[in-house]
Amino acid sequence: MEEIKLNTIEEALEDFKEGKFLIVVDDEDRENEGDFIIAAEKITPDKVNFMMHHGRGVLCAPISEERAHELELEMQVPDNTSVHETPFTVTVDRLGNGCTTGVSMYDRAQTILALADPNTRPSDLGRPGHICPLRARSRGVLRRAGHTEAAVDLARLCGMQPAAALIEIINEDGTMARLPQLWEVSKRFGLKIIAIKDLIAYRLKQESIVEKGVEVDMPTEYGHFRLIPFRQKSNGLEHIALFKGTWDENEPILVRMHSSCATGDIFGSMRCDCGGQLLQAMEKIEKEGKGAIIYLNQEGRGIGLMEKMKAYKLQEQGMDTIDANLCLGHKADERDYGIGAQILRLLGIKKMRLMTNNPVKRIGLEAFGLEIVENIPLETAPNRYNEFYLRTKKERMGHELHNIK
């Protein structure tokens, strides 16, 4: 069987600048699909026809959050419950400019061009329509490893307007095209094919999203460590790397990616297992003689201390930890692993033995181009205050908790 060899991001960017299609694939643990993606400002009726004929999916137009705001494109629903939280806005058609029903290849191309044109006003777009804009997250693939963000990132990296067109690639028999079939499609049409994880790695190498502080000695009750603070450039949040020992970049290092928990880490709360996991991680690293804890300022799975306390109040009234978050308008987990991934890279860690019970954390870090060679559980003994919480994490979030029957 022919070896599948993906293109480099540098090769892909050259084609993208010229208005050529790229095939972009995501992680097999996510959607495991490939999309045709092209810069919005390079679209033509013939290219729309190609996408519809050979892609067979849903024709969408990813745009930046800022662009969606400028065009007054509201989200399609206030509470997105789709599997991967695909960020659909209201659908649109270009008004005027020779457009009629909005469904022809010409009309669709005109609508996509209008989304990219900085002169387009909200009143130039009819709602609903035949094009589905997608609102990309700020910070792109460094925030969400999806095709929407990849498309906008590619446009920005090429110096174009932050807008693109994409469509999923479906086999002729109606099944989703996976990597072997996508590889054949790329050869058939002479298109470059790239992976989102490689785009993430490219951006992490090219861009700095955190500012490194001074390194200091940090003796603790659980071992002797070194500590470096990091400041997130986008919002000023400060994070910590607590580590011990030295290593080379190909060595699998013991790592704990730990989100801050003031109640558990500082006060020893029995409502969660956070404090116990942190201490276990420190003890394991001390025993091993090398390793790192990335302490992320993402209280309450990313919702903040005030909102976490509101969630606690709802839990006292009978809700579980997930439903409490959802009731408050949050996702079950809002953490951003891109920050931790860059901190690990700055520490020279590319391979790790990850200390976690959370499969989503593993997937989240692997999406940023890091290799996890082993998963090491950090289990604490349940108590009467946190047993329901731990059971929820096991049954609804897939955590590997053998102490919970």
Swiss-Prot record:
The UniProt site entry described as Essential for DHBP synthase activity is assigned to 130, 168
Positions binding Mg(2+) 2 in this chain are 31, 147
Q: Where is this region: GTP cyclohydrolase II?
A: 206-405
Q: What cellular component GO annotations does this protein have?
A: cytosol
Gene Ontology molecular function: any one: zinc ion binding
Annotated D-ribulose 5-phosphate binding lies at 30-31, 35, 144-148, 168
The record lists GTP as bound by 256-260, 277, 299-301, 321, 356, 361
Biological process annotations from GO = riboflavin biosynthetic process
Q: Which residues cross the membrane?
A: none
Q: Which reaction does it catalyse?
A: D-ribulose 5-phosphate = (2S)-2-hydroxy-3-oxobutyl phosphate + formate + H(+); GTP + 4 H2O = 2,5-diamino-6-hydroxy-4-(5-phosphoribosylamino)-pyrimidine + formate + 2 phosphate + 3 H(+)
Positions in coiled-coil regions:
none
The UniProt record lists the EC number as 4.1.99.12, 3.5.4.25
**Which coenzymes or cofactors are required?**
Mg(2+); Mn(2+); Zn(2+)
Q: Where is this region: DHBP synthase?
A: 1-205
Q: Which Pfam families match?
A: DHBP_synthase, GTP_cyclohydro2
Which residues catalyse the reaction? 333 (proton acceptor), 335 (nucleophile)
Endoplasmic reticulum as UniProt keyword: no
Alphabetized, the UniProt keywords read: GTP-binding, Hydrolase, Lyase, Magnesium, Manganese, Metal-binding, Multifunctional enzyme, Nucleotide-binding, Riboflavin biosynthesis, Zinc
Task: Copy out the cofactor comment.
Answer: Binds 2 divalent metal cations per subunit. Magnesium or manganese. Binds 1 zinc ion per subunit.
HAMAP family tied to this protein: RibA (MF_00179), RibBA (MF_01283)
Q: Give the family from UniProt.
A: In the N-terminal section; belongs to the DHBP synthase family. In the C-terminal section; belongs to the GTP cyclohydrolase II family.
Report the protein's function. Catalyzes the conversion of D-ribulose 5-phosphate to formate and 3,4-dihydroxy-2-butanone 4-phosphate. Catalyzes the conversion of GTP to 2,5-diamino-6-ribosylamino-4(3H)-pyrimidinone 5'-phosphate (DARP), formate and pyrophosphate.
**What protein name applies here?**
Riboflavin biosynthesis protein RibBA
Q: Which organism is it from?
A: Porphyromonas gingivalis (strain ATCC BAA-308 / W83)
Tell me what gene encodes this.
ribBA
